[in-house]
Amino acid sequence: MNRFVATAFLACALPCSAQSASDGIAEYRAMLADGNPAELWQAKGELLWKQSRGPKQASLERCDLGRGPGVVKGAFVELPRFFADTGRVQDLESRLLTCMQELQGFDAVAIAKTPFGKGEMLNIESLVAYVSGESSGMKFNVSQAHPEEKAMYEAGEKIFYFRGGPYDFSCASCHGQEGKRIRLQDLPDLTTNKGAGAGFGSWPAYRVSSGQLWGMQRRLNDCFRQQRFPSPGYVSDVTLALETYLGVNAKGAESIAPALKR
């Protein structure tokens, strides 16, 4: 009888404890939200957007993020999208690389090979914070009008469910079902509109644990690392396809980027 009572107590206490910890994390984030350090990256990003840089000594103020040259507000929530000038579906980071190469003369290939948090990659993270912040509070509306956009979504869905690696993991292993947690942190179900809105809609973000701002490309590459897969690479078709899948699933959700993460 005593063993039964103890087991019943633990069965009740553990979910309550996990929920209490989850609530505590949410409260902690809310306390920090008003002073999100990502604002420092946003401020730097705005300066970089307007500053003449690179071999061509030009600014990014003529960069077309999808709404016309120089238009920043509202662009982030419509990415990834197809761009006729490159013939590719591009996300924000991929498009920034294109503009940095075409307008400023930087070597996009060399930058893409730079480790996260180093060199020009630091500047891209600041630009990402600035551009995403200009669409904060707006709703995601990632297009599926072009055949290439549809193909990217379909590829992203397949990649999301692909299982492999030493752990036989897929993205769906952690993010394909409601109610999952890791280290007492809730994991959003990215196959649903609500979950994709909470997950996709909160990147880029300042990570308290690393003291750095992470873009979605860095987040996705780290997910592959955690699965023990080879790195897909910066702005690869794999990561762009996943972003398209998540972005379409998040249609109508409000962007809170740049957000705050543990």
Task: Walk through the language-model features, giving the residues of each.
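Hydrophobic, well-structured mid-protein blocks that either form specific transmembrane helices
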Residues: 127-131, 143-144
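Positively charged n-region of N-terminal signal peptides that target proteins for export
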Residues: 1-4
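Bacterial N-terminal signal peptides
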Residues: 6-15
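Electron-transfer interface patches adjacent to heme c in soluble/periplasmic c-type cytochromes
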Residues: 19-40, 50-126, 133-137, 162-262
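Short, charged low-complexity linear segments at domain edges
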Residues: 30-47, 138-157
